[in-house]
Amino acid sequence: MATLKQIQFKRSKIAGTRPAASVLAEGELAINLKDSTIFTKDDSGNIIDLSISAGGNISGNVTIDGTLRVNGPINNFGNFSTSGQITAGSSISAQVFRALQGSFYSRASTGETANAHLWFENADGTERGVIYARPQTTTDGEIRLRVRQGTGSTTNSEFYFRSINGGEFQANRILASDSLVTKRIAVDTVIHDAKAFGQYDSHSLVNYVYPGTGETNGVNYLRKVRAKAAGTMWHEICTAQTGQADEMSWWTGNTPQSKQYGIRNDGRIAGRNSLALGTFTTNFPSSDYGNVGVMGDKYLVLGDTVTGLSYKKTGVFDLVGGGYSVASITPDSFRSTRKGIFGRSEDQGATWIMPGTNAALLSVQTQADTNNAGDGQTHIGYNAGGKMNHYFRGTGQMNINTQQGMEINPGILKLVTGSNNVQFYADGNISSIQPVKLDNELFLNSSNNTAGLKFGAPSKVDGTRAIQWNGGTREGQNKNYVIIKAWGNSFNATGDRSRETVFQVSDSQGYYFYAHRKAPTGDETIGRIEAQFAGELNAKSINAVENFKVNGLSTLVGGVTMSNGLNLTGGSSITGQVKIGGTYDALRIWNSRYGAIFRRSETSLHIIPTNENEGENGAINNLRPFSIELGTGTVSMLHDVHLGNSGSSTGLLQVSNSLKTIKMICPVTINERNAALTLDSPSSSSANYLQGSKAGTKSWYVGLGGAGNDLSLYSQSYGHGLVISDNFVSISKPLKVGNAQLGTDGNITGGSGNFANLNTTLNRKVNSGFITYGATSGWYKFATVTMPQSTSTAFFKIVGGSGFNSGLFTQCNIAEIVLRTGNERPADLNAVLYTRTIGAAFKNIAVNNVSGDTYDIYVYAGTYCNQLACEWACTENATISVIGINSSTQSPVDDLPDTAVNGQVANVLNNLVDSGKGKRYEAESEIAINSQTGIRIRSNADKTGSVATMLRNDGGSFYILFTDKNDTDGAATVNGEWNSKRPFAINLTTGEVMMNNGIAVRSAALFYNSINVKDNGSINFDKSGANPRNMRIFHAGDASRGNRIEIADETNYIAYFEKAPGGANRFVVNNATVSGVNQMNSFGVNTSNALGGNSITFGDTDTGIKQNGDGLLDIYANNAQVFRFQNGDLYSYKNINAPNVYIRSDIRLKSNFKPIENALDKVEKLNGVIYDKAEYIGGEAIETEAGIVAQTLQDVLPEAVRETEDSKGNKILTVSSQAQIALLVEAVKTLSARVKELESKLM
């Protein structure tokens, strides 16, 4: 039995202390209170541990209320159950670990700085992989998945799951066999090298369904990029808006503000400004995009920056080469501004080659005028048989108008019409199938003596060349043909050969005249000339060297010279001059009784009779009845003269030489130019007049009644008349002409029109004068008028303009002013200025009532209104005074009177323009036409081919109509009714526009509302140029396939949009490849998109990438934001797991180094804590982390803390792990120094 001593306990409070054998008796107990262990001494004197760790068997249950510590293995051959935790210092092994409540926890081993792991091992204990959670910061957490790369590898692959930015997942590579669904993806490079054939790199096929116009939801925002923080931001957008073509476009701005480029679903591409192709050099300078200084703001350059197309203005662009304009393209022409060359060359003109056989270098589509020459086209440089030919065709004419004419070299000109042709050769030859006919005279203009018409000798026997005038049938034409020809018979083989050369004029009935040279006879060396006339010969002059023989009657019209007198016995009619010289008695006219001889004696010509019965040969007698003095023309009749026939064998005027009297028994009429009846008084003081009397009583006289020079026409019967004095004409009674009478008061009355009463007419006259307002524009006082109410009217016409420049025709202007008073309810004066052009002298008008019915009129005049012609008139109850009329330059007033009232200015429709401008009518107000057919526009008056267009409003519809074309000049078609075509009409009730004869749109067309294609119609695109097929867009479908919009060519469909009967939408492309960059709204990859906005989803509807603002790109997982990219920062709202994190720390990037002082003290002020953390301030805690508090770190090391924003935009603090490491490094170095110091002391 043990003694009491043996069951008493010896105690120790020092951990790890075992009792010595000397202090215990056998069986005596000792307890270590610190370690909770019991010891005793066995019979061998050894100290043994009585705790469970000493071994032994326990039969039955063991209840331990405290801690069970087992330093060795625990072998359990049954079930192991615990209601609490199992804590192992090393590891716990089992075949299977199963969490019946659904949770496994792995806790970091050493506070908040160690990892929490879940390991995967091979059978030999080597690592396969591990899932572990990294230490947390105050804001971030991270779980990593590390996988060993094979049993023979020493490297691992790690995958990170981070809490930042709403959650991030990081892997060197993500491989999804089916799909990867996420709201946001942040990558440097997306590689699709191993994708299957036919797969797309990405999808953004949004399924927006929107009502109304869809202007907003019809936009798919694809990408937004820039190169630097302050760089231009580019937006890639796909649109499918109602009323617009589907389009991909690229915009710039913080938001899509400025559209730069676009490509539509019909293949059209548009750029904001210009396009440069093939101009890039190294480093991509801005100058590669074209030379704006040379090419302008809008251009297309090719190859270099100053070659291409340059836009100039609406409808006009230039072809530019090397910075120089070489051609301008306008709406109506192609204008070459440099030397134009058309040719075919394979080396830019170094060598030129022929065009293809039967092809031209330049063809003009002149077949439009339906000419039937060849193919109707004009060809320049046409290869026909290897030779260059040129063809000009058309139903009109070709005009060549050059100052020095036209040269054809070599000189061959061939004119062809059907089977006929005429050829002109430079050697002078003309060859014609038909006779050459001249519509006008042939004039040989050369001054040399060889110019003339020459006829070669014909090659045919007995042939001759003739000039022939064909006979006609109209008035004034010759009936028979007339021929002039030369021939002869000297070379005849037989017969008469005496006529060497014959010149003959004949018609179809025989010869008129011939002259021939006879062959010489006898001793003659030159044959004589003979002429023969077949009929009468009428000649102005005939000079016969030899015999002159006339068989019939001869009429000599010209001069006849007879050197030995002339005896005419058969009568002679001479219409020309007869010259008789060398004799005094030149001409005798005689009969058997008397002869009358025309005799010239020195300076006189006499007609002298012969003595009786000496008519033929007698000499002159002594009578001189008629003589003319040839020097003075004085005619002398020295015997009695009787002029006229009184009916009683005496003359009406009888001059008696013997009685020295003149008797006149008839009225005298002097009716010759410069004829006069002269009364010559013997002295200047004598009276000189014609006196009239009746029955011996003086009744009138005309002349000078005394010594003065006043001429009187005086009626002695009435006692008054007309006196013409030196400075005036006096009349004492009114002067009457017809019914018109000039009174002694100066008034003219009794006439017609203005002369019914001249004083009244003058009172109503239009006054005129001039005014000058000079170089200064402004308000001028123009006139003062007195105009009673009810009513009076005045008008002014001002002719001239503002300025006087050559070529500015608008300065030749007419302005008119009309003033009219009111009806006294109230009293007023209306003023209207009618003007015609911008160059008018007067621009505005104002009226100021001075008092009563008196008004001042003011006008606003332009500059340089010099020398304006002015007319004015008014009703009889009004008066006008024009200020400055016919006077010097007027000055403008400083200001209009306060009581002045503006009148109205009316612009008169006119088409006056300055030089160089197209004439047109301009109006600043509407023009109302009260006719259903309001305007008719004729293309070329009433000429052939002219056509008229008309604007018509019949009350139901508005039409644009046109007539047929005029067939001939002056035809009435162009002025007649419209034809049956209705190219354009507007229903005036519904507003519907009808184009009943088709429509051709040559440029872009904009439709701001719907386009309805009815009756299964289609939109067709005809092939042209290099396009191989026709294209069309049409509406198709049936009950099984629903509705389709289909794009097809002549062979097959290309693509169609379909809404299936079930409501699903499809877009199908027939075996097509879509390349390039497309722009669209939000879309999903193998899923729909629920993120909206500018986003891409992957796999599920709320996981993907989304742009949430300018410079903000977020990644979502299950609609939770896990990551954000923005300028300067990268945010993760979840933990980030990575195999390693490398932060740029190159010393070459750093400067201004300073040590972290008192690092250990700073560390001791920090607290590592475990906490629950929310995603944003005020949000729910979403995870438990370990870390430090940013505010505490900021107190000791502010450089390690930075302010940023949480996902809700709240300002929060973040910490730098690199800064913390630097702080800990310095603290460890300080602690290490202290340990070394303590170790040195212990040593």
From Swiss-Prot:
Similarity section: Belongs to the S16-like long tail fiber protein Gp37 family.
Classification lineage: Viruses, Duplodnaviria, Heunggongvirae, Uroviricota, Caudoviricetes
Protein name in UniProt: Long tail fiber protein Gp37
PROSITE patterns for the chain: ICA
GO cellular component: virus tail, fiber
Gene3D superfamilies listed in its UniProt record: 6.20.80.10
Species the sequence originates in: Enterobacteria phage K3
Modifications after synthesis and translation: Proteolytic cleavage and release of the chaperone in the host cytosol stabilizes the folded protein.
Residues annotated as domain Peptidase S74: 1145-1242
InterPro entries, A to Z: Gp34_trimer, Gp37_trimer, S74_ICA
